Design a protein with these regions (language model features):
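Long, histidine/aromatic-enriched segments associated with O2/redox biology
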Residues: 2-409
C-alpha cells in the first residue's frame, strides 16, 4: 500500500434515506495507489461510523395535528441545518490541521406512542398510518430492571459526529427548547466508537455485518423497506430501529482465561472467525447461527434474517455498588422488525431450546454477564425532500415559507 492515509467517507446527505443509517460507508473500490485486496478485506463497503453518538429520546407536547406538523417541520429544518454547517475556520489555531468536516448526521425516528399512546389514545389521528411492525418494545429475558413500556417515547433523535462537543451543542438546543418548545426530551445516552473494529471486551466485531461492496446494495436490501413489503406507502425507503443499551459486567469476564472468553463468544478473539466445534450456547451460535442447507418453517435461510448493526460503547462510571457501568449501545436497523430482529432475539437468542433442546441461555447473558438496561423500537422514515418535512408522509401538512430562523444557529 502506498504511504498514504485514507480520508474517512462522508455521510450521504443527498440520498433518498436519512443520513446516519447506512452511511458513512467506504466505497467498494480502493482509491488509486492502495492495495485493492487489503482495502477490499478491511474497508470496502463497510460502515465507517462517526466517533461519537448521542441517543436522544423525546415526547411531543403538541395538542393538534397542525401543531405536530409545525414541530416536525422545524425539527427537519434544524437537522438539515446542523448537517450542512461547515466548521468555522476562525476558531482553529494557526498550526492545527484544518477541520473540513465533522461528518454530522441527525437521524429522526418515530416511536409507537406517536401513533397511539400507551393508554390507547389516537391523539393525532395517526393510528391508521402506523408502520406494520412498530410497537412498544416487549420485555425479554435479559432485561435487568428495565421495563420498555415505561421508557417508550414519541421520538428518537440520533446525533452522530466526529466531535463530541458538536453532539453536545445539538443536544443542548433540543433539551433547552431552542429548536421547538413542543419537544420534551426524556433521556440522552452518550456513546463512542473505538478506532478499530473491536467490541468492549476486545473481540473482533462486525465481520458478518452487511456491506455495500458489490452489485445491488446488499446493505440496503437488508435495511430499507420496499413497495412489496406490505407497509403503508409512506414507509417505503424507511427502516426500523431496534435500540438496546446492553450493560457488560466486564470484571467477571476478564477474570476468565482467554480460552473460556472465546467459548462464551464462540469465536476467535483476534480474528473473529468462528470456533469449530463451538458450544451450542455460545453467543455466535445463539444470535447468529450459520446452519448449512437449513431452511426454517418459513423457508428462510439463517443469512436472510441478518440486520445492520451500528454499535457504540458507553462508560457511565460506577453504579451505587461501586461496579463499573459500561457496555454497548446496540443500534440495529432492519427492513422487517419481526423477521430480521425479533426472530433472532426471541426464537434463537433467548430460546433455551435453541439450537437444540436444553441448550440454555446465551452464554454472554449468563450469571455476571450482560444485561439489557435500556432501549426501544422506532421507525426511521425516508429522507424528506426540500419542500417537505419528515412527517409529510403521515399527512401532516404545514403551510410554510422558509426554514424558521430559530433553527439556523
Amino acid at each position: 500500500m502506498a504511504d498514504r492515509i485514507l480520508t474517512p467517507p462522508l455521510p450521504d446527505y443527498l440520498g433518498p434515506h436519512q443520513p446516519g443509517i447506512t452511511d458513512p460507508v467506504w466505497p467498494a473500490k480502493a482509491p488509486t495507489g492502495f492495495d485493492q485486496a487489503k482495502y477490499g478485506a478491511l474497508y470496502a463497503g463497510q460502515l465507517e461510523r462517526q466517533r461519537h453518538l448521542h441517543v436522544i429520546t423525546a415526547d411531543v407536547a403538541s395538542r393538534t395535528r397542525e401543531e405536530l406538523a409545525g414541530l416536525l417541520w422545524t425539527l427537519t429544518g434544524f437537522a438539515r441545518h446542523q448537517m450542512a454547517k461547515v466548521p468555522p475556520s476562525d476558531t482553529q489555531r494557526p498550526y492545527d490541521e484544518p477541520v473540513v468536516t465533522r461528518r454530522v448526521t441527525v437521524t429522526v425516528g418515530f416511536g409507537a406512542t406517536l401513533f397511539t399512546t400507551i393508554a390507547g389514545d389516537d391523539r393525532f389521528n395517526l393510528a391508521a398510518r402506523r408502520p406494520a411492525s412498530l410497537k412498544v418494545m416487549p420485555q425479554i429475558d435479559g432485561d435487568d430492571g428495565f421495563r420498555p413500556r415505561d421508557h417508550a417515547t414519541d421520538l428518537v433523535i440520533l446525533v452522530s459526529s466526529d466531535d463530541y462537543y458538536v453532539n453536545e451543542y445539538i443536544f443542548g438546543r433540543l433539551y433547552y427548547g431552542g429548536v421547538h418548545p413542543g419537544i420534551r426530551v426524556r433521556s440522552v445516552e452518550r456513546g463512542y466508537a473505538r478506532p478499530d473494529s473491536r467490541e468492549p471486551s476486545g473481540f473482533e466485531d462486525g465481520i458478518t455485518n452487511p456491506r455495500d461492496a458489490s452489485g445491488p446494495s446488499s446493505m440496503h436490501d437488508f435495511v430499507y423497506i420496499r413497495a412489496e413489503d406490505g407497509e403503508p406507502e409512506w414507509c417505503i425507503g424507511g427502516t426500523y430501529l431496534a435500540y438496546r443499551k446492553i450493560r457488560r459486567r466486564m470484571k467477571h469476564f476478564f477474570e476468565l482465561p482467554a480460552q473460556d472468553q472465546e467459548a462464551v463468544f464462540g469465536v476467535d478473539k483476534k480474528t473473529g472467525v468462528r470456533l469449530e466445534p463451538h458450544q451450542a450456547h455460545a453467543h455466535a451460535a445463539k444470535i447468529n447461527p450459520r446452519r448449512p442447507n437449513h431452511r426454517d418453517l418459513f423457508d428462510m435461510d439463517d443469512l436472510e434474517r441478518r440486520f445492520l448493526r451500528r454499535p457504540y460503547f458507553f462508560d457511565d462510571g460506577l453504579d451505587a455498588d461501586g461496579e463499573e457501568l459500561r457496555g454497548l449501545h446496540h443500534l440495529s436497523f432492519a427492513r422487517n422488525l419481526g423477521v430480521q430482529y425479533e426472530w433472532p432475539v426471541l426464537m434463537w437468542q433467548t430460546n433455551p431450546d435453541f439450537p437444540v433442546k436444553g441448550t440454555g441461555q446465551d452464554a454472554l447473558y449468563g450469571p455476571g454477564g450482560a444485561a439489557n438496561i435500556g432501549g426501544g423500537y422506532y421507525f426511521m422514515p425516508a429522507a424528506a425532500n426540500d419542500a417537505d418535512h419528515l412527517g409529510t408522509g403521515l399527512g401532516l401538512k404545514r403551510e410554510h415559507g422558509g426554514i424558521d430562523d430559530a433553527v439556523q444557529v
